[in-house]
Amino acid sequence: SDVCMLERSVLTAGSSWHAAGGIHTLNADPNMSALQAYTIELLPEIEAESGQDIGLHMTGGLTMAGTPDRWEWLQSAYRVYQSIGISDCRLVTPDEARELNPIMSTDGLLGGMWADREGYLDTTGTVHAYAKAARKRGAEYYEHTKVEALEQTKDGWRVITDKGVITCEHVVNAGGLWAKQIGRMAGIELPVSPLKHHYLISDTIAELENLDFEIPMTVDLEGFTYLRQDQKGVLLGIYEINHEHWAMDGAPWDYGMELFQEQTDRIENELVMGFERYPALQDVGIKTWVNGAFTFSPDGNPLVGPVPGK
């Protein structure tokens, strides 16, 4: 309970407010897979304890492979899942995958993996659910409180903010787009950088109107895309091959709820592959584009753990 969180702006500012909200357990690192599975199990508990709706849709998830190497990797990941106790998944053929996601073309696919504990949620609702549950347990959070400096003492830290000074034993850097600057306040250089990331939301798709179930979260490893249902349309996200860094030294302090103009030329190849994988997209319009910033480490996983000497 002796914990407080400082938010420079308002909860969700930066990346959380515009995130696509996909949840999944598949990860190249089995430790991360186990952590992600634990988080998914925790979500209903957080929702119940906070009383905050998180918009949880447990649709299940497909991850599809179209080259021998990726198909072998998926089969290996499946075996790792079994070894660490994630048993609610199975390998599927392209035909089985098409039954699970009827708007997906299986041309060129060799197989995939189905996982029960995948889907998506409302990121804004989830952030507020965590905050409410934490406050119920005695923790606190303060919005509109900017960290300006960190001073290490023999007993811990002095956190200098624009509202005053907080003394504590430990500081956790959860700065997101501002993690680089927070790290430098503690005298460390973190290998993180904000990148621009696209997704689109389509207009209504007729095939989805006729289904009595929600299509699963689907990742196409060959097309560098992920897809989930959004009402009676879909959200198609792009893993940019030609990625673009932004604000390499950390986002401006006054950045918070902004987006960038979409850059369709930069993601043209992925868009073509996505529209071929989901042909229904070729017949509908695009309702919304989102091009927002997220902070990434070199391997895409979070930086977690103590800093030596700090």
Regions found by a protein language model. Give the residues of each.
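Glycine-rich FAD pyrophosphate-binding loop
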Residues: 1-17
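Flavin-dependent oxidoreductases
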Residues: 24, 46, 150-262, 269-282
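Short Gly/Ser/Thr- and Asp/Glu-enriched loop/turn motifs at secondary-structure junctions
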Residues: 57-61, 195-196, 289-291
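A short, glycine/Asx- and small/polar-enriched loop/turn
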Residues: 69-72, 103-109, 151-158, 296-300, ...
